[in-house]
Amino acid sequence: MIDIKFLRENPDVVKQNIKNKFQDSKLPLVDEVIALDEELRQNKKRADDLRANRNKLSKSIGALMGQKKFEEAEATKKLVAEQAAELAKCEEKETELEEKVKNIMMVIPNIIDPTVPIGKDDSENVEVQKYGEPVTPAFEIPYHTDIMEKFAGIDLDAARRVAGNGFYYLMGDIARLHSAVISYARDFMIDRGFTYCIPPYMIRGGVVTGVMSFAEMDAMMYKIEGEDLYLIGTSEHSMIGKFIDQIVPEGELPYTLTSYSPCFRKEKGAHGIEERGVYRIHQFEKQEMIVVCKPEDSPMWFNKLWQNTVDLFRTLDIPVRTLECCSGDLADLKVKSIDVEAWSPRQQKYFEVGSCSNLGDAQARRLKIRVKGEGGTYLAHTLNNTVVAPPRMLIAFLENNLNEDGSVNIPVALRPYMGGTEKLVPKK
């Protein structure tokens, strides 16, 4: 959410930003919110005038009574009552206008970074760099669930009977591998100075609307019936939410947290849920990282965050590349975003395994995350990035470490988390 003062003073900049994001249907909202904001400010001025006059008249009643000017005192009391009634109407109108302004501001997209490439959708994202040499094996690589089944490591049919599509049972060596990757990612981030955090897996509605757009909320979040609670789609939500309504000392910044959590997503939209496979599902686990920092430090932290993911994947012998997300692919709160994609030898192409985003002060403005510095109080900047998200990451791991005989190599970095195992051997 952008600053209403910025919008008021720079309507053309906001409109051009909307055009750059190919959201032209939102263009009329700029003039609409400016008009509502002007009405709100005039209403507030009227309320302030009424309040001041009412208080002045109220104070005069005592003096009039002391001077035995009873008729004047009674007349003044009536005038105070009339002004109080008018003030109540103004205050009611103020609440109504504030809600209208807030609702419109919530759907006007954040101002994107000037370095973001202009494009309509993810097909126009721009490759930044490749890391590692993509593998083209001499043998055919099976679909990822077929690999897992050879280890008796997955049961989608049982999961479908229990919960429907979009769920899975992982077992045996594949389940161990899943847990090993999460544990390794946790320690990897701790070694890089991040504080490990186990957050709530449910958050209140006010936190949800503070960390994401209405469109994202509708497509992702599961609501608990009868409660003001939602299952998290990512632990970023609850980690950023930790700082809601806080004024933090500038000297304590940055806050760098990493967390493990289950994630729950409706995956409502064009992609939907896979009938077979674990690439897009309703429930999965993820190691996440977030940063709360000073505005001038957020570009530096942005580059550090996505580099962490690249470095981790390279220690697991998985080639990756980074993509700069174009304007049309950025969610409304994001200033800048880079996707990390892993190489799929089976498909001979890259696929997304993580996303790093700089939200600027958008989440901080909604959640009122403020910083107290020498020059006063200001809004923090927030950033987030996927460290690793099994089981999607397992697809890349299994394909890139698979041998022709069906065994899977365990990279050196992961062996301590697999009891020293160097290779997984299929059971079937």
Q: Which residues are covered by each model-predicted region?
A:
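N-terminal alpha-helical targeting/anchoring segments
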Residues: 1-134, 149, 153
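TRNA-recognition modules of translation machinery and tRNA-sensing kinases, especially anticodon-binding
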Residues: 27, 130-428
